[in-house]
């Protein structure tokens, strides 16, 4: 499984997001995240913290989302040009995608 992950991530690593290539980069990102079962992180807003008295299952689900969100956000930043990294470094993965879609999704 690790070899599959590495080879799929190479899709993103071969050409960093520079703005012009958003549609291709986004397609490749979705392929990688789907294989890693983390695609939900760019599709769902950050959940509310369930709090200390919440059931264990809710806490575990929240922790998994936060951990996956961190992994995906770092992957996204690592596959962007330095200028785009600076613009997005204080955002979580979901916010990055929403912002990038606003800017670039009109590309044809």
PLM features: residue spans?
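N-terminal Lys/Arg-enriched interaction segments
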Residues: 1-108
């Amino acid at each position: 499984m690790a070899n599959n992950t590495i080879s799929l991530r190479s899709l993103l690593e071969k050409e960093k997001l520079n703005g012009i290539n958003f549609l291709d980069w986004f397609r490749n990102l979705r392929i990688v995240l789907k294989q890693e079962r983390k695609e939900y992180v760019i599709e769902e807003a950050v959940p509310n913290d369930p709090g200390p008295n919440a059931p264990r299952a809710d806490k575990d689900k929240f922790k998994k989302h936060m951990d996956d969100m961190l992994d995906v956000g770092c992957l996204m930043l690592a596959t962007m040009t330095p200028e785009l990294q600076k613009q997005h470094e204080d955002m979580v993965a979901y916010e990055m995608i929403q912002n990038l879609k606003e800017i670039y999704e009109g590309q044809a």
